[in-house]
């Protein structure tokens, strides 16, 4: 089957009413790759069947966070389930986790993150290869992820290398847009260009929306330089939203899970990927995202 287009534990204390991480029922599981006897899987959520001719719909593909060496795909079940109710096909992916960072790696020019990106590229190609069966438009795929997963989604769709030679031929990994939840970019990636988003970022970068807590150091040391480069390159649609006073992974729990999803929904509507208004209600507690100029 073909290609498809993220969330991390909060690092600051939240009120007890918001303590539980959002979740949703499991999607339908598919194997997108077999590697060394291990099945790599993704879960897909489909919209309810409608009467009449079926038109292909946009597809979302999400990659979980966890520091490249941890995390699970259930992080984006809530997001995928929601967007399936809005008429899209949405997938959340399991990928090969990176080995733990070691002192030796600091001396190497190759990042441990490479294995994650290779699997992500395989998942996107599988999504595109099976677009007809899945009911998606391979030219309207939205990629994304949270923290490490945000980084993985960005590099899997921009770096020309790190390909699995066993992937189906004739399918690239480009996408039409991004949903990015505090993507973890680092100046330390510069030693390995194939995992460094700043070196892969070009003027034709697709529309994106990124969410950060104002107290998240990953924003200051990673996304700020990328956002500045986007502006200098003339990237036309780079939406940057900030949750004041919040830290890394804030979007994993309510009310911010719904606040960010509502903003993502409106972003996709502006691009023509979705119709109507968000079906989630804004929190009565008044949490809002500020738009970065």
Can you describe what each PLM-predicted range is?
Residues 20-55:
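N-terminal cap/lid segment of alpha/beta-hydrolase-fold proteins
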Residues 122-203:
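Primarily recognizes the serine-hydrolase "nucleophile elbow" in alpha/beta-hydrolase
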């Amino acid at each position: 089957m073909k290609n498809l287009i993220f969330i991390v534990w909060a690092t600051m204390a939240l009120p007890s009413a918001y303590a539980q991480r959002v979740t949703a029922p499991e999607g339908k599981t598919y194997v997108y790759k077999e590697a060394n006897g291990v099945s790599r899987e993704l879960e897909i959520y489909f919209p309810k069947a409608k009467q009449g001719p079926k038109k292909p719909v946009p597809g979302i593909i999400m990659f979980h966070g966890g520091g490249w060496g941890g995390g699970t795909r259930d992080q984006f079940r809530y997001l995928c389930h929601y967007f399936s109710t809005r008429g899209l096909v949405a997938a959340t992916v399991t990928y090969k986790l990176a080995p733990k960072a070691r002192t030796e790696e600091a001396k190497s020019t190759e990042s441990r993150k490479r294995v994650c990106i290779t699997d992500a590229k395989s998942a996107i190609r599988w999504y595109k290869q099976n677009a007809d069966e899945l009911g998606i438009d391979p030219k309207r795929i939205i990629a994304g992820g949270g923290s490490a997963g945000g980084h993985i989604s960005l590099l899997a769709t921009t770096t020309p290398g790190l390909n699995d030679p066993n992937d189906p031929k004739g399918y690239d990994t480009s996408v039409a847009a991004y949903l990015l939840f505090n993507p973890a970019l680092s100046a330390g990636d510069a030693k390995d260009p194939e995992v460094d988003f700043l070196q892969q970022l070009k003027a034709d970068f697709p529309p994106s929306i990124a969410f950060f807590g104002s107290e998240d150091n990953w924003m200051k040391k990673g996304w700020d330089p990328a956002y500045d480069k986007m502006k200098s390159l003339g990237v036309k649609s780079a939406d940057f939203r900030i949750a004041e006073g919040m830290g890394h992974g804030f979007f994993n729990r309510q009310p911010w899970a719904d606040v960010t999803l509502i903003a993502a929904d409106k972003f996709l509507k502006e691009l023509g990927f979705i119709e109507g208004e968000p079906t989630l209600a804004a929190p009565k507690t008044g949490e809002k995202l500020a738009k970065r100029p």
